[in-house]
């Protein structure tokens, strides 16, 4: 199976809970290599651009407000079948439906404040990585 890259966000509520290290430890324990990461505070324009596919939906303004409410940590993860394995680790988008032991079951506060984001396809991962990371900011792990 080929090595894939996926995109991950630790959202403002999880950053505020000071669980970044715990989440990274779980990524690594699951076999992911962290090949790019940065902390930033999204502007309204960045949040609206990143979530543009949801523009016009009832939850869009609340999502933008939440995602600009504090710092986030964006990361690129690498492993075999990375997109699906990462989504499995995150758990259901709605934390009420997330299985015990998933990140959302452990760190989410609500459907909007669900602690984490993960790409839903390889195409989304490529687009989302390019949104936040420029040339040379992702370092492949070869060991």
Curated annotation (Swiss-Prot):
Organism phylogeny: Bacteria, Pseudomonadati, Pseudomonadota, Gammaproteobacteria, Enterobacterales
Pathway stated in the Swiss-Prot or TrEMBL entry: Purine metabolism
Family: Belongs to the NDK family.
Family matches, as Pfam families: NDK
Name the record gives this protein: Nucleoside diphosphate kinase
Subunit structure and binding partners: Homotetramer.
Catalyzed reactions per annotation: dZDP + ATP = dZTP + ADP; a 2'-deoxyribonucleoside 5'-diphosphate + ATP = a 2'-deoxyribonucleoside 5'-triphosphate + ADP; a ribonucleoside 5'-diphosphate + ATP = a ribonucleoside 5'-triphosphate + ADP
Keywords tagged on the record: ATP-binding, Cytoplasm, Kinase, Magnesium, Metal-binding, Nucleotide metabolism, Nucleotide-binding, Phosphoprotein, Transferase
